[in-house]
Regions:
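Outer-membrane beta-barrel proteins
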Residues: 49-55
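Outer-membrane pore/translocation modules
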Residues: 1-48, 106-107
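Outer membrane beta-barrel transmembrane domains
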Residues: 55-163
Length: 163
């Protein structure tokens, strides 16, 4: 149980408490109506917190294939993988093993997700260059460290503007 003055569990805190390197690389190519992209990004924790723990490093990779069918209407298939290391150390002010959320062994894991999407790019009028998109995903593989909720499905809706 949490009371006033207690620190929140690790993932509910507003930051990592460390300096982090954020490397990444993106590749995009287009041939007529077909677009292919791949991206890898990471979070590398460069130090520990003054409290005595360090969030795990992260690697996120995604690749997708998109096709524009006609006049701005397109669809896409995407594969996304996430790897998150477990926490190193612990915060001694938390009762680490009494609560699932404060146990440092219950963080991190591997997830692979498959996603499919639809989009429409407006080409004329006052909403030209606006894009709406909807994407649905399901987990293909999940291996969580410790006790964690698993992902069942994801939905993403967006509205963006290009200039």
């Amino acid at each position: 149980m949490f009371y006033a003055g207690n620190r929140l569990p690790y993932m509910m805190q507003l930051g990592s408490g460390t300096f982090d390197a954020l490397p990444g690389i993106t590749f995009v190519t287009q041939h007529e109506n077909l677009t292919y992209s791949a991206q890898v990004q990471g979070i590398i924790r460069l130090n520990s917190t003054t409290i005595g723990y360090q969030l795990g490093d992260e690697i996120n990779a995604t690749t997708w294939l998109g096709y524009t069918w006609w006049k701005g209407f397109g669809s896409s298939l995407r594969l996304e993988g996430n790897w998150l290391e477990t926490l190193r150390g612990n915060d001694p002010s938390m009762y680490s093993y009494n609560e699932i959320a404060t146990n440092p062994q219950n963080y991190g894991g591997i997830r692979l997700q498959g996603l499919a999407g639809l989009s429409y790019q407006f080409e004329e009028g006052f909403i030209a260059n606006h894009r709406i998109a909807l994407e649905y995903g399901i987990p293909l593989y999940q291996k969580a460290n410790g006790i964690q909720n698993k992902l069942n499905q994801t939905w993403m809706a967006s509205w963006s503007y290009s200039f």
